[in-house]
C-alpha cells in the first residue's frame, strides 16, 4: 500500500489535500517490526510518531514506574492499556512537545508495518506549509483530548468500583 493511502486512513490526516499528503509521505520512514519488538519504551525520549500501516501495536504502562501504595504488589509487569490496529496513530504527543514517552509500544502481531514521522522533519514541513501544520496540530489536539477523556472515564470507573475499607 502506498504511503499516501496509509496516511489518508489516519484520523489526524483526514482533512489534508492530496498534495499535502504527498508532502507528508515524503518525510515518512517505513519500518517493519516483529511480534514482541519494543517500538519505544515508557519514559524514553521521543522524536517520532507512528502510523500503523498493517498489523497491531500494544500500548503498555508499567505500574511500578508510578509508585505509590501497592506498586510492589502489582509487580513490574507492564499492563496493556490499548491495542491499536491499521490506520491508527501513536506517539503523536512528541510532535507537540519534547517530553518523555508516557507509555511503551510493542508489536502485537507476527509482523507490523509502520510509518514513522520524524519530529524534526515534520516541524520543518509545518514551518514551510503553516496551513498544513495547523490542520495536523488541531487534529492531534482533538485526538489527545479524546484519549484524555477516555482515561478520565477509566479513572472514575476505578474509583467508583474500588472496594472501600470496612468501617
Label each region the model flagged.
Residues 1-167:
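Cytosolic regulatory regions built on CNB/CRP/Popeye-like sensor folds
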Amino acid at each position: 500500500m502506498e504511503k499516501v493511502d496509509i496516511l489518508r486512513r489516519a484520523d489526524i490526516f483526514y482533512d489534508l489535500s492530496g498534495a499535502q499528503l504527498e508532502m507528508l509521505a515524503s518525510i515518512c520512514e517505513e519500518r517493519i517490526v516483529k511480534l514482541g519488538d519494543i517500538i519505544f519504551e515508557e519514559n524514553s525520549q521521543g522524536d517520532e510518531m507512528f502510523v500503523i500501516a498493517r498489523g497491531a501495536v500494544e500500548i503498555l504502562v508499567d505500574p511500578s514506574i508510578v509508585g505509590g501504595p501497592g506498586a510492589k504488589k502489582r509487580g513490574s509487569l507492564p499492563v496493556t492499556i490499548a491495542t491499536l490496529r491499521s490506520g491508527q496513530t501513536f506517539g503523536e504527543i512528541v510532535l507537540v512537545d519534547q517530553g518523555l514517552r508516557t507509555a511503551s509500544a510493542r508489536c502485537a502481531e507476527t509482523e507490523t508495518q509502520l510509518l514513522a514521522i520524524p519530529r524534526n522533519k515534520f516541524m520543518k514541513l509545518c514551518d514551510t506549509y503553516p496551513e498544513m501544520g495547523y490542520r495536523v496540530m488541531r487534529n492531534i489536539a482533538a485526538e489527545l483530548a479524546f484519549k484524555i477523556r477516555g482515561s478520565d472515564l477509566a479513572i472514575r470507573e476505578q474509583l467508583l468500583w474500588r472496594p472501600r475499607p470496612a468501617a
